[in-house]
């Protein structure tokens, strides 16, 4: 299958449009179409927040499952056998033009389990696809540096539909939810931490990131959670992705990888503390974080891992660390952050860059492959979209992906919020358990703001 032959792509058409507040427009799009996305930047740091994009009704949807690719196109569905589904995607990432950012292409998510296609590792397939992308050939782009809003189209011009939606007002929805309990009890999670520490003491690994999750039964408007999350935890990577029955809502602080005009960058985050109640307390907590030898050692380890990952696909001598161990603050937590860059080697593309860093060391551990094997044995449940990546592969060869954390992953009437903590030799199990709770706090607070709980006599069965 050749996407360029099927879609008969034109040169990009770009038209400036007057717009209301971006999210207000997206509410109308979300309620009108079965599949849509909003990739939004809500951070003053322009190094992380340059553009916001939204799109609707993709040309096709592509899903990867064990052994085959599934393509939905113009009302039909086809399946193709494949050993590595990511090779199928290369036809969509052929560089075409010099435009910056996203100019149409694949928008979607990659599940954590897809790491088995990038490295020799035995991970059990999850109940989510290994990846799921919509091919979006038009959409709306917001440039936060210039304040401009543009409609971009590579095929059919659907600007009249957008113009109609601009005149509509869609009321805020309401979400109802009921907790189905956590994936691991406190006692079991503490035991997992102890076992990971034993593996570290035996020299198998230096670090492993162990996660816990809370499952929910959902009713009502999933977008209400995103609207609340925008207020509670504005972040450089805000997203709401709806592809049929699956929706992912999140506010990730962490870039997995960005490729733009052959330049590669990533921002490893490791080292976490809660926010203070006052600016003075914030500074005190940050100073304590930056003097914590355990946190500093963990961060250094993950910066080195990021440097090694980029080194696999970068021109010799181009990998640099222009920003090292700075504090980045969000609504409920503050982190230590570094910036690692490189220049893509000749013959490599955005998929090579994605494969080199996936999954992030900050959600797996070091050495990465052995850490993932230990995580698989201890957690025993596929992570699915959590700790994978969400973003775009643009038809101009660019890519931008966030790590799928600080998110609700929903399918049908069920949703899951998951968060992890990095375990090292000096970890205190109770403290790591609390760190998982702190990292999930922004999404949990947003759930409370977006709606309320409901009671039901209906039995609930967790998807395990």
From Swiss-Prot:
Its cofactor is Mg(2+). Coiled coil: none annotated. Its EC number is 4.1.3.27. L-tryptophan binds at residues 41, 236-238. GO terms for molecular function: anthranilate synthase activity; metal ion binding. Feedback inhibited by tryptophan. One of its GO terms (biological process) is L-tryptophan biosynthetic process. The keyword Lipoprotein does not apply. Part of a heterotetrameric complex that catalyzes the two-step biosynthesis of anthranilate, an intermediate in the biosynthesis of L-tryptophan. In the first step, the glutamine-binding beta subunit (TrpG) of anthranilate synthase (AS) provides the glutamine amidotransferase activity which generates ammonia as a substrate that, along with chorismate, is used in the second step, catalyzed by the large alpha subunit of AS (TrpE) to produce anthranilate. In the absence of TrpG, TrpE can synthesize anthranilate directly from chorismate and high concentrations of ammonia. This is Anthranilate synthase component 1. It comes from Methanothermobacter thermautotrophicus (strain ATCC 29096 / DSM 1053 / JCM 10044 / NBRC 100330 / Delta H) (Methanobacterium thermoautotrophicum).
């Amino acid at each position: 299958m050749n996407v360029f032959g099927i879609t008969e792509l034109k040169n990009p058409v770009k038209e400036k449009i007057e717009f209301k507040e971006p999210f207000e427009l997206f509410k109308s799009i979300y309620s009108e179409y079965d599949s849509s996305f909003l990739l939004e930047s809500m951070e003053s740091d322009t190094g992380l927040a340059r553009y916001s994009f939204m799109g609707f009704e993709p040309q096709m949807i592509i899903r990867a499952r064990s052994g085959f690719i599934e393509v939905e196109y113009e009302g039909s569905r086809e399946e193709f056998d494949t050993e590595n589904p990511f090779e199928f995607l290369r036809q969509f990432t052929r560089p075409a033009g010099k435009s910056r950012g996203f100019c149409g292409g694949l928008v979607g998510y990659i599940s954590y389990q897809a790491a088995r296609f990038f490295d020799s590792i035995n991970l059990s397939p999850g109940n989510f696809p290994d990846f799921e992308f919509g091919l979006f050939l038009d959409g709306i782009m917001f440039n936060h540096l210039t304040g401009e809003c543009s409609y971009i189209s590579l095929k059919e011009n659907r600007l009249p539909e957008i113009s109609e939606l601009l005149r509509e007002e869609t009321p805020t929805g309401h979400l109802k939810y009921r907790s189905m309990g956590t994936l691991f009890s406190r006692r079991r999670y503490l035991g997992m931490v102890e076992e990971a520490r034993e593996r570290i003491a035996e020299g198998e690994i230096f670090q492993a990131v162990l996660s816990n999750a809370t499952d929910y039964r959902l009713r009502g408007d999933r977008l209400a959670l995103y609207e609340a999350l925008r207020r509670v935890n504005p972040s450089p990577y805000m997203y709401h992705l709806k592809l049929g029955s699956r929706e992912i809502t999140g506010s990730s602080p962490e870039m997995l990888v960005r490729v733009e005009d052959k330049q590669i960058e990533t921002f490893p985050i490791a080292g976490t503390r809660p926010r203070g109640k006052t600016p003075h307390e914030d500074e005190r907590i940050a100073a304590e974080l930056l003097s914590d030898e355990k946190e500093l050692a963990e961060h250094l380890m993950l910066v080195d891992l990021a440097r090694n990952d980029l080194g696999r696909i970068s021109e010799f001598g181009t990998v640099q660390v222009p920003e090292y161990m700075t504090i980045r603050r969000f609504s409920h937590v503050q982190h230590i952050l570094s910036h690692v860059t490189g220049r893509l080697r000749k013959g490599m593309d955005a998929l090579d860059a994605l494969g080199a860093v996936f999954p992030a060391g900050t959600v797996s551990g070091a050495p990465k492959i052995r850490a993932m094997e230990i995580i698989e044995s201890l957690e025993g449940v596929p992570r699915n979209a959590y700790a994978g990546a969400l973003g775009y592969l643009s038809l101009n060869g660019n890519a931008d992906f966030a790590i799928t954390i600080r998110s609700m992953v929903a399918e049908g009437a069920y949703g899951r919020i998951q968060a992890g903590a990095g375990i090292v030799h000096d970890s205190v199990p109770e403290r790591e358990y609390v760190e998982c709770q702190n990292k999930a706090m922004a999404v949990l607070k947003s759930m409370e703001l977006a709606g309320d709980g409901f009671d039901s006599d209906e039995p609930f069965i967790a998807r395990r």
